[in-house]
Amino acid sequence: MTQAEIKLCSLLLQEHFGEIVEKIGVHLVRTGSQPLRVIAHDTKASLDQVKKALCVLIHHNLVLYHVHKRGVVEYEAQCSRVLRMLRYPRYIYTTKTLYGDTGELIVEELLLNGKMTMSAVVKKVADRLTETMEDGKTMDYAEVSNAFVRLADTHFVQRCPLVPDTDSSDRGPPPPAPTLVINEKDMYLVPKLSLIGKGKRRRSSDEDATGEPKAKKPRYTDNKEPSPDDGIYWQVNLDRFHQHFRDQAIVSAVANRMDQTSSEIVRTMLRMSEITTPSSAPYTQPLSSNEIFRSLPVGYNISKQVLDQYLTLLADDPLEFIGKSGDSGGGMFVINLHKALASLATATLESVIQERFGSRCARIFRLVLQKKHLEQKQVEDFAMIPAKEAKDMLYKMLSENFILLQEIPKTPDHAPSRTFYLYTVNVLSAARMLLHRCYKSIANLIERRQFETKENKRLLEKSQRVEAIMASMQATGAEEVQLQEIEEMITAPERQQLETLKRNVNKLDASEIQVDETIFLLESYIESTMKRQ
């Protein structure tokens, strides 16, 4: 765990949950697993505060607990899961593109709340969608339920593990902490609910003394009975989203290298195996050309012969994204996911070197990568770059840890005159170094965004007050002159300052998302490589 990762975890926890949860979470990230009383003692927080903070972190899957041999419950932070909070906007946007506004709000609610029952999600999303509709229109619960079922069928949401039913005859002492289990076949099984009702608008005139709307409620709440899916909680399956991001990156890479038809064939192969292939698998399931041909999108008019030619072209490509086994029946084709990720990570490194040091350095990097080991004189000859420039470029990349220098002595005394000095590239080491820098960049971006917001806090509060006043006056039917007077409470210089702030914050947000895309590619490559070793 590097200092950059710990700092980023701290910023993310503080931004999402506040200071107390951030203090407990970062303490666990730094120290590893600890029992409750040790956490309270070390952080100087009260037991009640620690318990509440741990409840929040466990509910959002950011902390795990396990029973020690001596019966003590220890809590352990999941740093990698905390860092996934960076990707929340990307998860939500992806769901919007695949399943529309309803799917987007379902995933958003699950991410914001950690775990929820299906009935609670459906009700909340229906209410939110009804708020955005025209007067007189409402969102039916059944429509939201259908979107939820589609997300479960494609494994984007999954059930949370449950406490198993215990035998009532077993009167032994209860365990210090419950053990949560779930059958793999039940992870995506949606409970059969007959949710009848529509979304409701929040209006003061429709609320009773308790603050609850008087509109028609679902049948199961009328009798104050627990919902039929009480105890069955759902969460977002982040691994499935990562699989989708990886597939999109591979399809985009094939489109850039070849053409749109090739990328569509690869997309079809990935779509056919997305449910059957585990996210950590190095290869997809083998597919015949006939299966691929039958699964091509409707209206994609290419003949079987043309498809076979494209598959042969993809299989013969030096990058080896597609592998072929056997020739019977046209052969079986697989996508080599590990090699695809390695190519994407290498391309990312080349791009960074080109941006930082120029095209000549990128040429030298590609050359050393291709030849594995080269002396300085060989680099000069192969790259056709003058000796002085080549030396400067090699030392620049060496000092930044993009390339390595390997010493091979001819004699045991390691005398410089009798030693070969070979330049080489360790892609895994370079990827780790770049990943560390990406974490530092994201932390700097978040701090800058917080600074910009803090500097203009008074102006932002004034703007929000004016907007609230205008909204209430519009609702009561105020005249245009009155609205204009309220609007003029913010002066022209202040309005210009707000526009500048908005533009800067949008740039910082966009930069965070772009850096996170690089982080995802590098993390996927490192994880895939470590599993192969």
Swiss-Prot record:
Family matches, as InterPro entries: POLR3C_WHD, RNA_pol_III_RPC82-rel_HTH, RNA_pol_III_Rpc82_C, RPC3, WH-like_DNA-bd_sf
GO cellular component: nucleoplasm; RNA polymerase III complex
One GO term (biological process): innate immune response
Subcellular localization: Nucleus
Pfam families: HTH_9, POLR3C_WHD, RNA_pol_Rpc82, RPC3_helical
Disulfide bonds, paired cysteine numbers: none
Compositional bias per record (Basic and acidic residues), positions renumbered to this chain: 211-227
UniProt keyword annotation of Hydrolase present: no
Modified sites of kind Phosphoserine: 194
Disordered as annotated region, ranges: 162-181, 197-228
Predominant location: nucleus
Signal peptide from the UniProt entry: none
Record's keyword terms, sorted: Antiviral defense, DNA-binding, DNA-directed RNA polymerase, Immunity, Innate immunity, Nucleotidyltransferase, Nucleus, Phosphoprotein, Transcription, Transferase
Gene Ontology molecular function terms on file: nucleotidyltransferase activity; single-stranded DNA binding
Role according to the record: DNA-dependent RNA polymerase catalyzes the transcription of DNA into RNA using the four ribonucleoside triphosphates as substrates. Specific peripheric component of RNA polymerase III (Pol III) which synthesizes small non-coding RNAs including 5S rRNA, snRNAs, tRNAs and miRNAs from at least 500 distinct genomic loci. Part of POLR3C/RPC3-POLR3F/RPC6-POLR3G/RPC7 heterotrimer, coordinates the dynamics of Pol III stalk and clamp modules during the transition from apo to elongation state. Pol III plays a key role in sensing and limiting infection by intracellular bacteria and DNA viruses.
Known partners and oligomeric status: Component of the RNA polymerase III complex consisting of 17 subunits: a ten-subunit horseshoe-shaped catalytic core composed of POLR3A/RPC1, POLR3B/RPC2, POLR1C/RPAC1, POLR1D/RPAC2, POLR3K/RPC10, POLR2E/RPABC1, POLR2F/RPABC2, POLR2H/RPABC3, POLR2K/RPABC4 and POLR2L/RPABC5; a mobile stalk composed of two subunits POLR3H/RPC8 and CRCP/RPC9, protruding from the core and functioning primarily in transcription initiation; and additional subunits homologous to general transcription factors of the RNA polymerase II machinery, POLR3C/RPC3-POLR3F/RPC6-POLR3G/RPC7 heterotrimer required for transcription initiation and POLR3D/RPC4-POLR3E/RPC5 heterodimer involved in both transcription initiation and termination.
Family: Belongs to the eukaryotic RPC3/POLR3C RNA polymerase subunit family.
Name of this protein: DNA-directed RNA polymerase III subunit RPC3
Organism: Mus musculus
Gene symbol of the encoding locus: Polr3c
